């Protein structure tokens, strides 16, 4: 529910019950600024739940609105200029002739000093549950604590090592980490050359076995274009955030996860406030620091909340290629262009994509256009230096597209041939 949507619902509710105030702003400004203009105890006594017909037939009505207002009245200030309110609320059942048990929830709301709703939760009544089992789509423990009740004992029954063994051995998924950079592409810095080269090389190796990829939502069209340019007729992509429990790629031979995304500091601050923890971004206390580390007594909680979106988003993306245990003879390999995964999750690590410069492409284009050339001939017939020629050829000589006849040329020089000229190097 957006701030604007909640504002309209609260205004309509206040009008219906003829409250002493009439708007969302009247309420939250009093709480945030502490003006004391409103008697909150009196307002709490005025709160009532309208009859069910009002909820059924009023477009701006919502069954949780009375409880949300009560939670706001209970709000207290927390870290990062957030206010957190909570209440237990029994909401009206709108099903005609309903004769079942009451529906009770714990409502929690987080709003900031600008009067914007940051988080809004309706926690189910778990009192009759003997256990609640959470799947690995949301594995971070602080989020589980925030999304349930403090009275529920929480345990992680599968550790990350066991989880990876299950992915690799039972679901036949191999993960290859490419390079050692995070490649966080939430808003900018999508590495077009590296992604383009990786798509080209994967397509060349796996042919029709490579047709898909996953990246940040902002760059799905870029990834689709790179896949198309690599020869994929109808590329299929997913983006971080819509990949959970989607099995669209479970029959693919090879896949690409390009980069990762990270939550904003404000997003993590919302959860830190909700959990009543003490942590702040390191860059808030050190002007020269540009990373995403957190400091404070509960910095570890903030780091887990960061991992909930960054690391686990990449893991979920990789998992879209995993096979079911009913496919024991089939498997997939996923190339991950980010270093955010725990070391134990990468079955193999290869060097980062190396993008050729103009001189390197000139040298290799010359090799490709001639039927066997020596380094000396390249040096003589291009404007590349002798050292640049030798460095480029030595850099590429172990790749399958470059062939070398050792000592086959004049003065026992090596003779080089090329099947093609890629835009860069990567081991796939």
Question: Language-model features: where?
Answer:
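ASCE RecA-like P-loop NTPase motor cores
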Residues: 1-428
């Amino acid at each position: 529910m957006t701030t604007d949507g909640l504002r309209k619902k609260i205004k309509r509710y206040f009008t219906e019950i003829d409250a002493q105030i009439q708007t969302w702003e009247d309420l939250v400004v009093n709480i945030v600024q502490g003006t004391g203009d409103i008697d909150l105890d009196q307002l709490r006594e005025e709160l009532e739940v309208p009859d069910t017909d009002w909820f059924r037939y009023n477009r701006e009505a919502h069954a949780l609105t009375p409880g949300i207002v009560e939670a706001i009245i209970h709000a207290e200030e927390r870290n990062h200029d957030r206010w957190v309110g909570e209440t237990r609320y029994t909401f009206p059942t709108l099903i005609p002739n309903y004769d079942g048990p009451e529906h009770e929830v714990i409502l929690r709301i987080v709003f900031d000093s600008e009067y914007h709703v940051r988080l809004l939760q309706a926690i189910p009544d778990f009192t009759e549950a003997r256990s609640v089992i959470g799947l690995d789509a949301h594995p971070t423990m602080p989020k589980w604590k925030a999304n349930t009740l403090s009275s529920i004992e929480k345990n992680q029954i599968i550790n990350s090592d066991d989880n990876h063994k299950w992915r690799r051995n039972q679901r036949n998924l191999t993960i290859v980490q490419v390079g050692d950079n995070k490649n966080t592409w939430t808003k900018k810095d999508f590495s077009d050359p590296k992604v383009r080269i990786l798509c080209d090389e994967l397509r060349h190796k796996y042919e029709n076995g490579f047709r898909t990829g996953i990246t940040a939502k902002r760059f799905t069209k870029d990834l689709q274009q790179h896949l198309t340019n690599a020869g994929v007729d109808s590329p299929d992509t997913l983006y971080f955030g819509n990949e959970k429990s989607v099995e669209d790629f479970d029959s693919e031979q090879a896949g690409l996860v390009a980069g990762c995304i990270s939550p904003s500091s404000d997003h993590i601050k919302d959860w830190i406030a909700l959990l009543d923890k003490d942590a702040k971004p390191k860059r808030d206390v050190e002007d020269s620091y540009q990373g995403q580390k957190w400091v404070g007594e509960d910095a570890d909680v903030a780091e887990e909340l960061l991992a909930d979106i960054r690391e686990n988003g990449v893991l979920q993306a990789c998992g879209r290629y995993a096979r079911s245990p009913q496919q024991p003879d089939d498997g997939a390999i996923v190339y991950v262009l980010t270093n955010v995964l725990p070391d134990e999750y990468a079955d193999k690590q290869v060097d980062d994509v190396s993008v050729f410069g103009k001189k390197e492409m000139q040298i290799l284009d010359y090799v490709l256009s001639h039927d066997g050339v020596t380094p000396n001939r390249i040096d003589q017939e291009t404007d590349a230096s002798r050292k640049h020629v030798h460095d480029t050829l030595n850099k590429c000589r172990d790749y399958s597209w470059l062939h070398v006849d050792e000592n086959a040329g004049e003065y026992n020089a090596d003779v080089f041939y090329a099947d093609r000229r890629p835009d860069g190097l990567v081991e796939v």
